[in-house]
Regions:
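Elongated, amphipathic alpha-helical interaction scaffolds
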Residues: 1-185
Length: 185
């Protein structure tokens, strides 16, 4: 077991503790999304559990929040390489969506826009990117976007495409992995 001094922000305990501070989670989201105007409306909730029925699998979101534009964020740190992360993000997306509409809501346009963000110290897709952003697109016409309001972002702290993303995001991702007490800020 690691000591507290050996933990980085990719370790669940420290990630949850830091992101439980609304200003820290807001700052992280601003950097990740490149949106300086992003303001959280609700305090961040760590370890938010969503359940539907006792016999079905529930989920526990690392850090859940909503901004003043009513966009929903789930931010996860995933230190262990698991090949099912894309399907896990789909499962989390469906759970988040199922809790957003009330009985009797007639329009699915009432669904909030959602962002599932997973930060990893490995390249899940093997292309050397720091950031992989996914939206639903038409296979026959990739320029046709479904516009369903769902965004999934996979961040890799060990990317190599430095010229394609902001220096601030690169520094943030490097800090996520190297953030022990021995590292100067």
């Amino acid at each position: 077991m690691k000591t507290l001094n050996e933990l980085t922000l990719l370790d669940k305990f420290l990630f949850d503790e830091v992101m439980d501070i609304p200003e820290a989670h807001e700052a992280a989201l601003r950097i990740i999304l490149g949106d300086e105007n992003l303001r959280l409306l609700t305090p961040s909730q760590t370890e938010k559990e969503l359940r539907t029925a006792p016999w079905l699998r529930s989920i526990r979101l690392d850090v859940y929040s909503m901004d003043e534009n009513l966009r929903i964020y789930n931010t996860e740190a995933q230190k262990t390489r698991k090949p099912d992360l894309p399907r896990r993000s789909r499962f989390y997306q469906s759970f988040m969506d199922s809790s957003l509409l009330k009985s009797g809501d007639e329009s699915f346009n009432l669904l909030n826009d959602t962002f599932n963000i997973i930060i990893t110290p490995f390249d899940l897709f093997g292309e050397g990117r720091y950031c992989y952003t996914f939206h639903a697109r038409c296979d026959e016409n990739p320029s046709l976007v479904l516009e369903d309001g769902a965004t999934r972002i996979f961040l890799n702290t060990r990317g190599t495409n430095r010229n394609e993303i902001s220096e601030e995001l690169i520094q943030f991702l490097e800090y996520m992995e190297q953030s022990t007490l021995d590292v100067d800020i």
